Amino acid sequence: MLGSICIVLVETTHPGNIGAAARALVNMGLSDLRLVRPQAFPSPDATARAASGEALLSAARVFSSLDDAIADCGLIVGSTARTRSVSWPVMSPSEMAPVVLDASHQQRAAILFGRESRGLTNRQLDRCQLFVTAPVDMNHASLNLASAVLLLAYELRKSALLRDGSAASDRPTMGKDLLATSGMVEGFVAHFERVLHAAGFLEQPSDKLFRKIRRIFTRRALEEDEVNILRGVLSAIEKRIDGAANNR
C-alpha cells in the first residue's frame, strides 16, 4: 500500500525542506519522493536535513513538469490551505488517508505539495481529483512544508496499520476496474479540447471556461475503460466533423 503512494514536491525553494521531507517519509514507511523543478537539488542542505532519509533522498526523481511527475499515477491529491472559486471535495488528513490507500491498490497515488510561499497554483490543482487541508488554527495556519508532509504521511501509515495491521509496501494490484493514470486523463483532456475547437465551441479561448469543463471529467478518478470509451466518442465526432468539412 504505502509503497504505491508517491509524494510530489512542486517547485520547492528551500533544499533543506526537501531533506526534512525525505526524513519524514522514511519515518512513516513511504519510499517514493518526486521533485518538480526544485530551486536547488542536489544540495548539501537537503542531505544534512535528511538524516536517516538520505538513501530515499538520493533516489528521489526530478521532473521538468508536473504532468511528467504524475503521468503513471491514478488518484492525484492536492494539499492546499486556500479556498478557491471552483467547488471540489476537500478532506481532512484522516479522511484522505483511507481513500488514497484504496486507490493505491489499483494504480499509484500521488499527493502534491506546492511551493513554500504560495502552495499549489490553480493550474496545478486542476490535475487533482480531491484535496486535503489540515484543520490547523486559522490564526496560525501556515505549516512548514516538511511538517505538512509528515502530518499526511502519518495519517497514511496510521490508516494502513488500522486496516490490516500492516503497512507493507506492496505494489498495486491489477483490479478489473483499473484507474486511468494521469497521463491517460491528460491525453483525453487534450483530445477533448481539440474537438471543441474543431466544432467551433471554443472559438474564443477562455481559460476559466475550460477549467470548469476539465473539472467535469477530473472531479473523480476515471477508470481506464471510461477514458477509452470517451476517446472513442471523440474520435467518432472528429470523423463526422472532418467529413462535413470535406463535403462543403
Which functions belong to the PLM regions below?
Residues 1-248:
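Post-transcriptional modification and biogenesis factors for structured RNAs
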